[in-house]
Structure formats: structure tokens, C-alpha cells
Amino acid sequence: GKAMHKSLGNGVDPADVFNENGADILRLWAASADYHADVRCSKEIFKQLSQNYLKFRNTCKFMLDNLVDFDPEKLTKPEDMPVLDRWLLTKLNELIEKAEQSYCDYEFHIITHAVNDFCVNTLSSFYLDIVKDRLYCEGAESATRRSAQTALYLTLHTLSKLFACLLYTSDA
């Protein structure tokens, strides 16, 4: 890309980005930029970030919708969970470790990319697709349904904490 200069008229006005996409997209762009290299800025980048943000929000909404009848005081113990739910918690712990280290190193772009990958690949494309039957078809007191809800609750709670510093809408 070309360098942006106000005199060339090829700059991107943050107020325009804010008005078109909202503050969260502007924050997400700033957090997802690798400041060790030239920071890219374009309508296409903001469009992609908007799509990623929508996927993140939809994933969180799906999890929240499936926790309506869930009591956080009755979490399923990991040793009582099916392998798939324990696998998700392992992946979640890996994400936590990566995010904690990235926060310590001020590498916010690593966090945004890791959370996006986790939401799109680990959750949406794999885990949530498999556990839908447990969530929709099993009884409210089913042990396997409660196990899936426990995994969703812990995941949603963690994602909101991981992104609270970056996105206002995920403030815990």
C-alpha cells in the first residue's frame, strides 16, 4: 500500500470510521494492528474487521442464548465432562495463556487474532456445531447438556474478560 498523507488526500479519518462502523471496530482495528510493521488502514480492512466482530458477537450470542436455564452455581466438574467438553476447556486454557502473555508483552494484535481464530474455528466450525443436539434435544437436567452449558458458560465468561480491555461491548 501507499503511505497515507493528508496532503495527498488518501488518509482515513477516524471520525468517518467511527460514524460508518462504530467505536468497537475502530478499537478492534487499533488493537489488531501489528505496530512493529507499517499499520495498514483501508475500507476493506474495516469491512473484514466488521465481519470478524459480527462472528464474535454471534458466537457469544449463541452461547448466551443457550445459558438461559443454566445455574452457574451448578458447574459440571471437568472430570465428569465428556471428552469433547474437556477438549474445549483445554483449548480455552491455551487461549488464556496466549492472551495473558500477549497482554504482558503489549502484543494486542496476537490476542485479537487468537480470539478470532478460537471463535471461528474452535467454537463455531467445530464445537458448537457438534453440541447443538445436546443443547436443543436433551432435557434441561441432562448431565451431558449441563456439561455443554458449563463449557459454554466458562468460555463466554473468559472471552468477555479477555476482550474487556479492548472492546467496550465485552466489558465484564
Model-derived segments and spans:
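Conserved small/polar residues in nucleotide/adenosyl-binding loops
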Residues: 169-172
